[in-house]
Amino acid sequence: MKKLLILITIIIAVYIGYEMGNGILNTQTVQTQSQTQTQTRKPESTDTISQIKNIFDNIKTKLEGNENTNENKKETAKAGKNESQTFFERLNNIRNIKPAIEKYKQNENFVPSNEIPDLLKKGVVATEDRRFYEHGAIDIIGLTRALITNYKANRTLEGGSTISQQTAKNIFLSHERTITRKIEELFLAMQLEKSYTKDEILTLYLNTIYFGHGTYGIKDAAQTYFGKKPSELNLAECAMLAGLPQAPTAYDPINNPDDGKRRMMTVLTLMTQEGYITTEDALKAKKEFHVKKG
């Protein structure tokens, strides 16, 4: 519990500091590394800044990992030059994540927004991040709610990550649970929110999330579970897929059909509560649900 509170405090502090840093970047002249090295003593804040610099370096490396080998070689050749970059210069280098993401979208399995059913998008929002259209990269209200719920239950029942954070993690980061990775995730999620619309972020999420049964992305998931293209999915199938990311193995409708169907009904209930569908729609969908045999 204490670790989680500390993590939340750090994330909020970094978030505020980053936004302040954006303004400072345009007005402040920062000392070069060579000037800093002439100082005989370093203040304690220098260690903190150095740690955050390392985080930016890690993110920059992951972004560059999406480029081709030749580009990586060029960056390696420039290593000496990059070492002399200031904190805010490094920050500026990771602000534009579009090239890496646009290249990712060229993947043959990438499904554009207009081929993804609106009901699937609504099912994901109702299940994963119901305030998705109301908050930015981080949802303080949702995070607080999850914290309280998990504390009362004395176990993890709800996650606090937004769809934007999950998308950033899916594309750029590993799934290790460390403070450094969480901060990296937040910075990248902020860039997603600044560079893309909500619908574009949701489309990226659906193309990168793990749906279980060895499938990543909505194209493979729709084919694996239902033998269909994403655009052909009905309400029941959309609800089933929207409910998988939280526990894809447990809710796998092929290996665990009963649990999978219960999960589908939970998602339909959530969609009804959010006003996306009617109770009649949910009951009809339950009767129409059929899974492709494994």
Language model features by range: what are they?
Residues 2-294:
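Juxtamembrane regions of bacterial inner-membrane/periplasmic proteins
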